[in-house]
Amino acid sequence: MKKVFYILLFAGMILSGQVMAQNKLNFGLSQPQDKATLPVSSSKPAVALRKVKTANPSTLEKVSDNEFLLSTGWELTDANRLTASGESVFNPKLNTADWYNATVPGTVLTTLVEQGVYPDPYFGLNNLYIPDSLCRKDWWYRLPIKLPENSSGKSVWLLFNGINYKADVWLNGKLLGHIAGAFQRGEFDATPFLKSGGENILAVHIFPPRNPGIPQEESSKTNAGPNGGQLCLDGPTFISSEGWDWVPGIRDRNIGIWQDVRLKLTDGVSIIDPQVIADLPLPDTTSVSLTIKSIIQNTSARSNQITVTGRIDQIEFSKMFYLKPYESRTITLTSQEYPQLKIKNPRLWWPNGYGRPELYKLNLEVKCNGNGISDQKIIRFGVREFSYEMAVAQPDKKMWRIEFNPIQSAGKVLFNNIDRVDMGNGTFVPQLVSSADPSLLTSIDKDSKNPFLTIKVNGIPIFCKGGNWGMDDGMKRVSREKMEPYFKLHKLANFNMVRNWTGESTEELFYDLCDEYGLLVWNDFWLSTEGYNLNVNDNQLFVANATDVVKRFRNHASIAIWCPRNEGYAPLLIEPQLTALIANEDGTRHYQPNSRNLNLRPSGPWHYLSDGADYYRSIAEGFSTELGTPSIPTAATIRSFMPLEDQWPISDTWFYHDLHDGQKDYLRAIETKYGISETLDDFCKKAQLVNYDSHRAMFESWNSKLWNKTSGILLWMSHPAWPSMVWQTYSWDYETFGSFYGAKKACEPVHIQMNLNDKKIIIINTTLKSYKLLTAKLELFDLSGKKLSAKSISTAVPANKLTETFVAELPESAPQVYLLRLTLTDKNKVVSQNEYWRTNEKEGLFDELNQLEAPYLTAKIGKQQNPGKTIIVLSNQGKVPAIGLKLNLRDPQTGKIVLPANFSDGYFTLLPDEKKQVEVEWNSAKISNPEIIVEAYNLKRQGIAMVK
């Protein structure tokens, strides 16, 4: 069998166009690693205590009159145990005392951890104590359900919004159907199999992927190991759950009912996958024409008169027609037929920093033969229109820069991504397909030197800034309560784009929150690095999942790009299907066939650069979907996920939490710049200054070339999937640190900066507002806070442009360590302030900071704006600067840091006799009166003295 498998696999790679030496492909580990290389803790293993199973009756949580969530009363067991019992899962009187109370939505591992079978895998080395066999067995979910009172005479449907990896769905011993792939819905007509009285037994048989792979466990004796392995063969699934260099192997590979389950009632007719298309007469945005499309399906054996009714705010419309028995029809409602669908002065959806992300709701209802509502859909959408500037190759191979608006191309495929043309330096451009109509494109430059993608929203070019999400949560625990603070942090960091890397965060809530917070989405599908990671075994399954994802999520305003894979092109058998899918089933967005290279710059680097000016000199250009540097969190965060014995010095537990070989330069820089660390707190405070400078440098290098063949930069990564020591701007527990504030500073909508390569002082304005006169000021201060020099200039600052001011003249007589502060003001109101601690030493030594005395800080609480939001006025009444100031809130009862708590600034300098206002926001429902604590490079964490 093994021989046959590899023959078929190789044949598949030939057909897919991925013909290369077998030894270049990553199959992961073929056997578990040597036990001598496993990470070791100095702490005793955690002991889990299983909870007693409780009676948890199922309930129907009402969503609407005809729709209910099935989230309580679920039970779980592994199939081997059920088989050994000799009992039938369909028996209403089955004794389930030895089953688990299941969490739905949730993975198998989520249930087992919540039920105390295994310890929290995110703490220390606990993940090692959870058997990897969880992903190598079948599981059964079971739910007794009673029908709602209003179900009589109606069709009853069961809707599964996401299972992993495959499932058979049974009701009262009858097979309803199958679901395959982690991202495909399953909807089943349960009506013929239901009992009108008493309980119905819903049972779901979960099958794991066939190729779960073997994770490498990272330690000080190993490197990060392979990124993934055999699990890639089974895509679409969560391929990183086999283990990547930012997350360990998740023991169940996230199998289970990971999204919600619903019961729906209809009365003979259903609405299927409606779509709202907003067409603006760009550049005019004072009106919009809406088109509404939907499949209407007659699910009955009789002909029916159908009435579809829609409502958007105060606008109403309806359409009546007839459907034959079991007939499905796509209806299209346009503003030509329904003039009310042309809306004047619409509220536009904008990315963060460009305007408000306004959203509308369409309430679509369908009735059958004049009876009550049979089905209803509420679709939230934004009035916005995407267009894309990019280059294509002409027959003479010269670059033609064009603007492409998918709505205008009316579902036609225009680009030939397979016969692409190499433009040098790792960047390619597509050709036009032979049948392409050039009149569907807007010509910008027939002899362009700019191959790179620019995304435009409502006719305005957007300077894309943000980061990658490898996975929202390593165990797919994705409630709104848990996830929303992360999106809020992205907004507060002034980001406007996130990348759904290899599609592993594909769920409704992810897109809902991106819509609400104005975050554009670069959306990958479920393939990774071409030529290294394996292609999928089942192309048909892959395309089926992709089709369902596009139909399901295409109304989300935030999705800007569909992309087939991380770092590469789709296999040749899949590529034309995906191209046609996006054109036909979406028709409003660009299909970007590669996450690097095609109309993009190559991705990386991902390691620390000792000289931030190198980003300016050789890296900043074009649009990059991955640029990263390590990012160790605060000491408080490390203490929260690691036993005391492993916290300091650096231990195997650090390595298991993603501190790997690629961070040697980063660790060396912390020591070289700031000195050898004696404690965890000492090390982490130094790391935060490195984090701040490195993350700011990446974004500011892109700023320095705004619209000069430069249009977007996404961090690898902005969001952690678990408690990590590597790529992130905040920690998994919402703690913000140097990386967050450095990125936030550089991504300010109006920002003043000094280019590290040429010392130019420039102003970046990525807003739609022009300023007639702003004043840019440069000041130098020594370590006592004494001002050494100053220079200022006033200038106009146009909207969405870079403005140069002057070159910073840094005196040779400056002390070894000094502060360079830039301030941008509008009539004495600070618009932007940016600080660089500088050194005259070539190696950038800041050891003089270690000799500073502690400042004396006081605080005054300003007027509380509302519960959970207030202003803190900090004052430095000491004789030395407070460097790298970091604020937190603390629970006075427990002494623990309050998270999330969002501060408007962090890791800033407060000179002697200076004051600074900092705004803080937290969840006042959890704690109403927290303490304020402060720490700095030269100040240990302490409560702060309050003054009147």
Protein language model features and the residues they cover:
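Short, conserved micro-motifs enriched in small and acidic residues
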Residues: 351-354, 685, 689
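Secreted/periplasmic carbohydrate-active enzymes, especially glycoside hydrolases
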Residues: 1-7, 20-465, 470-473, 477-497, ...
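Substrate-binding/catalytic cleft of secreted carbohydrate-active enzymes
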Residues: 433-434, 440-445, 497-661, 669, ...
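Short glycine/proline- and acidic residue-enriched helix-loop micro-motifs
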Residues: 674-685
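Alpha-helix initiation and N-capping motif
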Residues: 96, 254-255, 635, 663-667, ...
